[in-house]
Amino acid sequence: MPQNSKYSDTQFENVMHDIIIALEKHQASRDLSLMALGNVITNIFMQQVNESQRSEMADKFTQVLLKSINAK
């Protein structure tokens, strides 16, 4: 997912690598991977985002995700 971020490319790539390795280690199917990642995202929203900002942030996240998967 393309991003403009305060995080370095290296830091981002390292986190992505670790997530992918974990999914591969458990031989997670596409559906299981999406379920697990969805639950991780939900947990992040519930634990790290103020309740008053969750809906707006979730909408923005969804828009970025759709833009990313529809990019040609």
Swiss-Prot record:
<dbReference type="InterPro" id="IPR009857">
    <property type="entry name" value="UPF0352"/>
</dbReference>
<dbReference type="InterPro" id="IPR023202">
    <property type="entry name" value="YejL_sf"/>
</dbReference>
<protein>
    <recommendedName>
        <fullName>UPF0352 protein Patl_3379</fullName>
    </recommendedName>
</protein>
<dbReference type="Pfam" id="PF07208">
    <property type="entry name" value="DUF1414"/>
</dbReference>
<comment type="similarity">
    <text>Belongs to the UPF0352 family.</text>
</comment>
